[in-house]
Amino acid sequence: MSGCGGSCNCGSSCSCGKGGGCNMYPDLEKSTTLTIIEGVAPMNNKGMVEGSIEKATEGGNGCKCGSSCKCDPCNCCSASTIWT
């Protein structure tokens, strides 16, 4: 059974279908915080932790409102997504 029925919709919270797939962790989808602890990770010449911010964020499974009120990306709503 898919967590969101294979359908995306973009409502007031840009949620995903019936099962709440994209809205399952709303605190992670609505804000992202990057914490740098100096002395633990190698620093580059700009004072940033080496690597990209994308690696430090949730992982790209959240829905964002795109054009025509559709969730973009909507990979959380794939038919292969199974919530146990």
UniProtKB/Swiss-Prot annotation:
Metallothioneins have a high content of cysteine residues that bind various heavy metals. Keywords: Metal-binding, Metal-thiolate cluster. GO terms for molecular function: metal ion binding. Disulfide bonds: none annotated. Belongs to the metallothionein superfamily. Type 15 family. It comes from the Eukaryota. This is Metallothionein-like protein type 2. The lineage of its organism: Eukaryota, Viridiplantae, Streptophyta, Embryophyta, Tracheophyta. It holds the Pfam family Metallothio_2.
